[in-house]
Amino acid sequence: MATAKRSKAKAAEAAKTARANAYAADRAAAADVVRATKIAKRKAREAKKAAMTDTAKDKEAEEAAKTARLMAEEATKAKEAAEEARRLEDKETEWAQCEEELFASKFRRFWNKFYACRGRGITFHQTTSIPAMRYTFPASRDTPDPMDTLQFKSVKITSIKECLHWPLQVFGIVTARDILDNKRNIIFHRPRNSCQTITEEDPYLALTGPSRAIAVSIDLSYIEVSLKVKGTTKAEDKDLSDLIVTYRSGYCLTGVYPSRLSTLKLEFSHVSFFVEATICIKLTGGSWPIGFQSVFTVGTSTDDVLVKLLDSEHDGLPVDANGVTKLSRRVVSVGLEKFLKVQLMAISINEKQVIESSEATFKPERAGISLINLSLGFCSMEVAVALSCFCDE
């Protein structure tokens, strides 16, 4: 009996254990299913994301390829446009007879870009604001020094095209721009209503400048020529010469420059270690005789080419109410190691020869005024030379 009870108890315990094991197995299986489901879902999400990434990459690659094609097309169009622009520019400028004439057609745009548009407060047509004799009597704080300069001697029309005929009624402007202020320093200026008559026998412009000495440095500076021939009406005016000539230290040589309707010869020289000389000539006694042309020139001890200060061309001596001669030009440059020679001549209108002449020689200084009295037989004259160095303004 006792044995049967023990057997029954063991059977019950075994059944209970079996049920517990079955329950644990069910729970483990359920947990495995949940884990497997989560893993499957995660893998599915990763697969979907990877698929989306691949799609995006494919789309990006397609967009990049499209952009590259568009950029290539734009580059091709830009190249074609540049070639067309160069072709048109070549066609538009094929008339230019020299580089200086070609540069003239672009100079104003170039100048405005580098000077007017950089906050310097200057315009293309402004003339130099630096006067002659700026440092003839320097203040104690001033430190002017000699500089290199451009000595303008002459502008000659050496030839004209067949569509023009001598004499020419010429107007326009010749200027120099230097490093001191980059503004126009007038060499020649005639408005349309005050033309100069240029003949084949005397083809030189009547220069009236510079208003101060023209400085030269290693930086490029510019000579600007814009001359026209007057027609019956403004519409019939013709461009005689348009040039931009560059100059710098070591490169200031006389040159011949062809243009559409003429060829010009610009004669100038490079003066080293110079001072500016401003000349004043005054009639102090006697009078200029009738029938005599007045010609005043200036040069240096080593320069064969004279700068003409005055050529009355006709009878008389032009003076103001105080007897001061109305010189066409009054500013020249002279090296400190040279001498300045001023010559006064009275030329017979009828005989075309020098009847009276006198010459004054000056030793240049860095500053101050030198005076010499001259006599021409029929009158006496005082020659004053004001000397000045320069500061970079």
Model-derived features with residue positions:
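Peripheral membrane interaction modules
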Residues: 77-159, 179-393
